[in-house]
Regions:
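Penicillin-binding protein/beta-lactamase superfamily catalytic region
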Residues: 205-313, 326-331
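Bacterial Sec-dependent N-terminal signal peptides
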Residues: 1-21, 355-356, 368
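Active-site helix/loop module of the DD-peptidase/beta-lactamase fold
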Residues: 105-143, 190-222
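Active-site SXXK
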Residues: 68, 85-111, 138, 180-184, ...
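C-terminal outer-membrane/trafficking sorting elements
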Residues: 359-434
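A small/polar active-site loop signature that marks catalytic segments
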Residues: 140-216
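N-terminal leader/targeting segments and the immediately adjacent pre-domain N-terminus
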Residues: 15-80, 85, 103-108, 140, ...
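Short, gly/Ser/Thr-rich active-site loops of penicillin-recognizing serine hydrolases
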Residues: 330-361
Length: 434
């Protein structure tokens, strides 16, 4: 019994010790401690290729934090440390945490029906159908509302129509998420910017503001403010010993699979290292991790045009990217671009391998994103194989039997699927047409 008690004490001590190793910058001013890549034993000859890649992909700001301290901080063009940029859907995690704070304060319960806060008739569903939708369904993208109407951002009842029973279908749908703002405003009795500022922003020294250019509510801030929020996520909702989200159960649920349809999605948060994943504007379930060259325990806030917060608890690492679209596809979730960053970042950290390390037997697309020719390689292609290209909705675009260099210059920009069937295997790869 004494040994068990001693073990519990030691584990608790080590857990607290790990938390104490994180550095937190002051709430005001520009002071922020730094570490050099040399101090960490990183391979500095990989930094310039990383920066060259980022600049070529329209990046404006890029930061890497280790143990809360800045290791890499690079701004491109006229963008500087104090420049403001939009988060796009990376801001969804801000709302996800804010809902958890409101619940901890007793203002709402995520298992309550959404109509309690949005009013009856917030959709065009029948009352029975609408009453099945809860706040949790809005957090997990399982509202069952139709995301394929062509008005996925529209929050008017006429735009919110029935597709499936709540909880039975995962679809990346902005409108139900955006309406969480009104849920929070109704529950708190405060303006969304006001409640956000007092609950998160001021407590961690962020700057920024929520603005509504249309139906969407978009957060704008500096890259360092984005890094501050990444640090809050890394420390599980606690800032320098002060709880911001004082609910460890909610945080755990936020950063773990929230349903069994898309294993790689928590509460408005993307997850890595799962057996499968889904992407916006598609009902296809892909096998493997969302970001294959990144650590399995990574979770992320990802936004359109490559707005990225990567958090890696096992390495006490935070990676931030702000900027314009890295290519012409304008994907809602930049998982391919994010993976390309990790390939180069692994070289910088002298860790060129990952759980998805490529070997000669694996089939892989060359030069992804693709311009005119879709080329792929792998030793399993030495025999006969069938190659097919699909769009993300699953529609067949073309077949090319026993041809690993396919002309795709006439395809529209966006994400596609390459399916390769050999005599022994069936492989599906996502790729992006610039």
């Amino acid at each position: 019994m004494k040994k068990i008690v001693l073990a519990i004490i030691v584990i608790g001590y080590l857990t607290n010790l790990q938390g104490q190793t994180l550095y937190f910058p002051p709430l005001t001013g520009n002071e922020w401690q730094k570490l050099t890549p040399e101090e960490l034993g990183w391979c500095t000859d990989g930094i310039e290729p990383l920066y060259t890649f980022l600049e070529g992909k329209n990046t404006k700001a890029f930061l890497v934090l280790k143990d809360g301290k800045i290791v890499l901080e690079k701004y491109f063009g006229t963008f500087v440390q104090d420049s403001i940029w939009y988060w796009a859907s990376a801001g969804k995690t801000l709302t996800g945490m804010l809902v958890g704070i409101a619940q901890k304060e007793g203002l709402l319960d995520i298992y309550e029906k959404s109509s309690k806060y949005l009013g009856e008739g917030w959709t065009s569903l029948s009352k029975d159908q609408e009453d099945l939708i809860t706040i949790r369904h809005q957090l997990t993208m399982t509202s069952g509302l139709d995301d394929g109407t062509g008005e996925a951002d529209c929050t008017l009842p006429s735009c919110l129509i029935y597709k499936a029973e709540a909880g039975t279908r995962w679809a990346y749908h902005n409108a139900p998420y955006t309406l969480l703002d009104k849920v929070i405003e109704t529950a708190s009795g405060k303006n969304y910017n006001t409640y956000f500022a007092q609950s998160i922003k001021n407590k961690i020294g962020m700057n920024g503001i929520w603005l509504k250019p249309d139906y969407n509510n978009v957060y704008y801030s500096t890259a360092r403010s984005m890094a501050r929020y990444g640090l809050l996520l890394l420390n599980k909702g606690v800032w320098n010993g002060n709880p911001v989200l004082n609910d460890s159960v909610y945080f755990k649920n936020m950063t773990n699979s929230s349903q069994n349809i898309n294993q790689s999605y928590g509460y408005l948060t993307w997850l890595n290292g799962k057996d499968s994943y889904m992407l916006p504007q598609s009902q296809i379930v892909f096998g493997g991790s969302t970001i294959k060259d990144a650590p399995d325990d990574l979770f992320a806030a990802l936004g359109k045009n490559g707005q990225i917060i990567n958090v890696v608890p096992s390495k006490n690492l935070i990676v931030i990217r702000m900027g314009n679209p890295p290519n012409q596809s304008g994907l809602f979730v930049p998982n391919v671009f994010n993976n390309d960053i990790w390939k180069l970042l692994n070289d910088v950290m002298c860790n060129s391998t990952s759980s998805a390390e490529v070997n000669e037997n694996q089939i892989r697309v060359l030069n992804n994103p693709v311009r005119d020719r879709l080329s792929f390689t792998g030793s399993t292609l030495e025999g006969y194989f069938e190659a097919s290209v699909y769009d993300v909705s699953g529609k067949l675009i073309l077949n090319a039997n026993h041809n690993n260099d396919i002309y795709v210059g006439n395809l529209a920009s966006g994400m596609y699927l390459l399916t390769i069937r050999t005599q022994t295997d069936l492989k599906t790869i996502t790729w992006v047409k610039e």
